[in-house]
Regions:
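Sec-dependent N-terminal signal peptides
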Residues: 9-19
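Sec/Tat signal peptide C-region and signal peptidase I cleavage site
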Residues: 18-26
Length: 308
């Protein structure tokens, strides 16, 4: 019975934290946003003259049992001179809670000047939330442990805008545009555990993302970038990054994340193969406050450029 109670407490903590996260940054986090910007803003699909497939796998708290694990696969690119198309599927798992979804996007781009282009995008799809209750209770009347998994599926949408030039871009996106209401706890759970609300809301976020590529010479370039994330009631989070590329073959960079009172840093490395494949890796360095609990974060990216 002691084991069951410990598992029960563990699940309860995850659920309460999960519901609490509905008031904070709710969406999967990635470090290599500059290499997978479509996962942030669907409007960038109109910025490229080719189709790209990106796959990202992230283990956010390595060494911590049942820490966040994220997988994202995206395909996007220019369909014709004005239209960009794209699609994404993803999975985000933390302990007994999971979030998965899929979406497709349509982007329309048009020139502002000879060198500057504006793109507008609408992305639509679904999101499924799940709490796994795979425990057996000794007492049949246990209101939380009895019954099956909790599953809730909701429609989702994102609006994006992107302004781009030859070597720069800046854009904004509003994910979770519909602000759908989410119910993961039944009435018995809410009553017995005295939760203040059994409902959560998928709050609309505001993302602003930009980058500029500067060629130092014919072999070396640098790319500073930033990624701002904002949601009502939560302090704005800002990521600053810079990467340097040599002969368009290998690159390295750093990313600095400012999040409330807790900041963090990540090191990034990558390799481009024949202008068709690119590999990326980032290591999130744990802060002095968290190093006793986990050994950092690992994120891998594989990109494939398709011939148009």
């Amino acid at each position: 019975m002691k084991i069951i109670n410990m598992k029960k407490i563990s699940i309860l903590i995850f659920v309460i934290c999960f519901m609490g996260a509905l008031k904070a940054q709710q969406l999967p986090q990635i470090t290599q946003y500059m290499n997978n910007n479509y996962a942030i803003n669907p409007a960038v699909a109109g910025m490229y003259d080719y189709y790209q497939i990106n796959s990202t796998i992230r283990n956010q708290w390595a060494g911590l049992n049942e820490g966040p694990r994220t997988s994202i696969i995206s395909i996007y690119g220019k369909h014709n001179s004005n239209v960009g198309l794209g699609g994404t599927v993803y999975s985000d798992v933390t302990g007994p809670t999971s979030r998965m979804g899929g979406s497709a996007s349509y982007t329309y781009a048009f020139p502002i000047t000879q060198k500057i282009k504006l793109a507008l995008a609408l992305q639509a799809g679904f999101t499924q939330f799940k709490i796994i209750k795979n425990l057996r209770a000794e007492y049949e009347n246990d209101p939380f442990l009895k019954g099956g998994d909790v599953v809730e599926a909701l429609p989702d949408a994102t609006f994006g805008v992107n302004l781009s030039g030859n070597n720069w871009y800046i854009g904004a996106a509003i994910p979770q545009l519909l602000s759908s209401e989410l119910k993961l706890m039944d009435d018995d759970f809410a009553r017995i555990y005295d939760t203040t609300s059994q409902n959560g809301k998928l709050a609309s976020h505001i993302y602003i993302l930009g980058a500029y590529t500067y060629d130092i010479n014919s072999q070396i370039s640098i790319e500073p970038s930033f990624f701002l994330k904002s949601v009502a009631g939560v302090k704005t989070q800002i990521d600053f990054g810079i990467k340097s590329e040599y002969k368009k073959l290998i690159w390295a960079g750093i990313n600095y994340k400012m999040n409330n009172e807790l900041s963090s840093m990540a090191a990034l490395f990558g390799y481009n193969i024949n202008d068709r494949f690119n590999l990326g890796y980032s290591y999130g360095i744990p802060s002095s406050m968290t190093s006793n609990y986990y050994s950092g974060s690992h994120e891998f990216l594989l990109g494939v450029r398709l011939p148009h």
